[in-house]
């Protein structure tokens, strides 16, 4: 994701259209700093305490628009062709594939989706022609020791529903919005299979934020379309969104997901075992469907996820007196009572992942940093100043789990116990 500041998402029990228009614009700003699309020319990024790696020309990977999307009817929100960035693997990694799904929030109204369609989160007309591959996408063995020489793909996010919208939900009254996220996912995966992924011996599906949620929604589909003898696993980064009320007791995220699912026809893309038992929008929450995923999954998530704290727990509309204003922007500015509330959010996450903790094939790295999307920045993925739990970086932990070197169920102690944390500061 890429971001300076956040805007309000909720007003009382319903998010107003004006709120979502502002929020969608906020998502545009947020998505490209924390995802792999770091813009080195931008001067409007959050301040942090660590140095960032210099981007070299070899880090830049060109955009490719899908060659099969048009015939498949797979379009971005505005009707443009979806795209991806592909870096070919080499040597021992030539038959290994890492596919990453970009994040960038969601849109739940015609107004917010229309606004999104005028940005790179809804139209390939605004995509950068080159992006820097960092973190889990890096080809530098010092930054990405486990997967540096794999085939790596970054699929751009331009549908607004975690690659899960369906055309049946589109308007027939002349409103030009294309809800084709599911078709984009299927078309690009088929394209990658034709490029050699059908012969993969090892593969990982990853994603950040809304893309991290998508990596869970589509995990088994990914597994089922690769060779049966391939080692296929999924890694969700910052995609474990909680179904918890905001500080005023309003069902902020649940109401939002309800609107996303209904607007974009997401129900058929969700886990059908879950949908058969409960209201479909609840099946957007990983705690409701993670147990049904057959493919091994690794969760990377901060227990103090700043996106969720700023948008789910304490949206500005739930803070009318602005008593949370400083805390939301910088966790070091939170007072003792606010820290108690944040610890409560952490407790909710611990409860939500409790069942998954018993999954023998699953893995997790749950740190106590004020962060979001940690696999796509080299400084948080694997560097001298990366967050560590039990002296392991995220990259080392994912590697130990993927290659079956050891079980990995790492849960950090509560904030502020971890001095290695990379805490975002939006002031």
Swiss-Prot record:
Show the GO cellular component annotation of the record.
extracellular region
Enzyme Commission no:
3.1.1.-
Cross-referenced SUPFAM superfamilies, in alphabetical order?
Answer: alpha/beta-Hydrolases
Q: List the disulfide bonds.
A: none
Active site, UniProt feature: 209, 305, 372
| Carbohydrate attachment residues | 173, 391
| Localization annotation | Secreted, Cell wall
Q: Give the observed phenotype of the deletion mutant.
A: No visible phenotype under normal growth conditions.
Q: Which family does it belong to?
A: Belongs to the pectinacetylesterase family.
Q: What does this protein do?
A: Hydrolyzes acetyl esters in homogalacturonan regions of pectin. In type I primary cell wall, galacturonic acid residues of pectin can be acetylated at the O-2 and O-3 positions. Decreasing the degree of acetylation of pectin gels in vitro alters their physical properties.
Record-given protein name = Pectin acetylesterase 5
* Highest classification ranks of the organism: Eukaryota, Viridiplantae, Streptophyta, Embryophyta, Tracheophyta
């Amino acid at each position: 994701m890429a971001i300076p500041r956040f805007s309000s998402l909720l007003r009382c029990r319903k998010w107003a259209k004006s709120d979502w228009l502002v929020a969608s614009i906020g998502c545009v700003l947020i998505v490209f700093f924390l995802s792999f699309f770091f813009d080195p020319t931008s001067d409007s990024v959050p301040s942090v305490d660590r140095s960032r790696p210099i981007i070299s020309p070899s880090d830049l990977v060109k955009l490719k628009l899908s060659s099969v999307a048009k015939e498949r009817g797979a379009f971005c929100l505005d009707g443009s062709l979806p795209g991806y960035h592909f870096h070919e693997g080499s040597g021992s990694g030539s038959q290994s594939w890492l596919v990453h799904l970009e994040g960038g929030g969601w849109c739940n109204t015609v107004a917010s989706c229309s606004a999104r369609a005028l940005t790179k989160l809804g139209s390939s007309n605004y995509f950068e022609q080159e992006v820097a591959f960092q973190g889990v996408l890096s080809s530098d063995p010092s930054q990405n020791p486990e997967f540096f020489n794999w085939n790596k793909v970054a699929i751009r996010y331009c549908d607004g529903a975690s690659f899960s919208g369906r055309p049946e939900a589109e308007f027939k009254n002349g409103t030009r919005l294309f809800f084709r996220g599911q078709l984009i996912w299927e078309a690009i995966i088929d394209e990658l299979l034709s490029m050699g992924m059908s012969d993969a011996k090892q593969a990982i599906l990853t994603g950040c934020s809304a893309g991290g949620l998508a990596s869970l929604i589509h995990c088994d589909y990914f597994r089922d379309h690769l060779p049966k003898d391939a080692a296929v696993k999924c890694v969700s980064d910052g995609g474990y969104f909680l179904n918890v009320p905001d500080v005023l007791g309003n069902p902020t995220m649940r109401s939002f997901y309800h609107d996303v699912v209904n607007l974009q026809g997401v129900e058929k893309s969700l886990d059908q075992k879950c949908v058969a038992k409960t209201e479909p929008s609840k099946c957007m929450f990983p705690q409701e469907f993670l147990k049904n995923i057959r493919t091994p999954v690794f969760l990377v998530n901060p227990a103090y996820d700043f996106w969720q704290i700023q948008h789910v727990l304490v949206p500005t509309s739930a803070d009318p007196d602005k008593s949370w204003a400083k805390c939301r922007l910088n966790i070091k500015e939170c007072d003792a009572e606010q820290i108690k509330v944040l610890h409560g959010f952490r407790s909710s996450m611990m409860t939500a992942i409790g069942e998954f903790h018993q999954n023998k094939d699953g893995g997790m790295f749950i740190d106590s940093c004020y962060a979001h999307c940690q696999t796509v920045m080299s400084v948080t993925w694997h560097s001298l100043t990366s967050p560590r739990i039990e002296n392991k970086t995220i990259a080392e932990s994912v590697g130990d789990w993927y290659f079956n070197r050891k079980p990995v169920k790492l849960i950090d102690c509560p904030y502020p116990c971890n001095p290695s944390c990379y805490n975002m500061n939006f002031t």
